[in-house]
């Protein structure tokens, strides 16, 4: 009985807990995004060899965000973070046209993973402040997202250094996850 009352109170008054995995190729801006959300400021980053994990509270939701390094040698380790992931944030450098196919390939590999079958997908089309950045429509096409039939997904234009679009993406993510 006590557990039931406790669960009821946490549903009414408590923060909802969500496990989010944030991945993408190296230098896409994952760590910058994480700490912009957590601290509200830009921090100096170095390539992530392993992971950063932080809790980000936003609109009565407690996001546990796992930022996993994106260098090609450590991408096989991504699968160790898949379990219990409710939301997948895939960060793409919109300005890096030479590597967009590599991003698409990595994303498609992840979406085939059984442990991620129920995770909603939020793509952050990052670095939109750059003059050659691909717009959302072009990036959506190059990532092949329009072919995803059995998954909820959304692409949000972002600029991590300015914070533009980050909270819009979290709004979408929290809305989708709250429906589950």
Swiss-Prot record:
Keyword Protein transport: yes
Subcellular location: Golgi apparatus; Cytoplasm, Perinuclear region; Membrane; Golgi apparatus, trans-Golgi network membrane
Lipid anchor positions (N-myristoyl glycine): 2
Keywords, sorted A to Z: Cytoplasm, ER-Golgi transport, Golgi apparatus, GTP-binding, Lipoprotein, Membrane, Myristate, Nucleotide-binding, Protein transport, Transport
Entry GO MF terms: GTP binding; GTPase activity
Gene Ontology CC annotation, any one: extracellular exosome
One biological process term in Gene Ontology: intracellular protein transport
Residues the entry annotates as binding GTP: 24-31, 67-71, 126-129
InterPro entries in UniProt: Arf1-5-like, P-loop_NTPase, Small_GTP-bd, Small_GTPase_ARF, Small_GTPase_ARF/SAR
Bridged cysteine pairs (disulfide): none
CDD domains the record matches: Arf1_5_like (cd04150)
SUPFAM superfamilies assigned to the protein according to its UniProt record, in alphabetical order: P-loop containing nucleoside triphosphate hydrolases
Topological category with respect to the lipid bilayer: Lipid-anchor
Family classification: Belongs to the small GTPase superfamily. Arf family.
PANTHER family linked to this entry: ADP RIBOSYLATION FACTOR-RELATED
Family matches, as NCBIfam families: small_GTP
Chain's role: GTP-binding protein involved in protein trafficking; may modulate vesicle budding and uncoating within the Golgi apparatus.
Oligomer status and interactors: Interacts (when activated) with GGA1, GGA2 and GGA3; the interaction is required for proper subcellular location of GGA1, GGA2 and GGA3. Binds ASAP2. Interacts with NCS1/FREQ at the Golgi complex. Interacts with RAB11FIP3 and RAB11FIP4.
Name listed for the protein in its UniProt record: ADP-ribosylation factor 5
Source organism of the structure: Homo sapiens
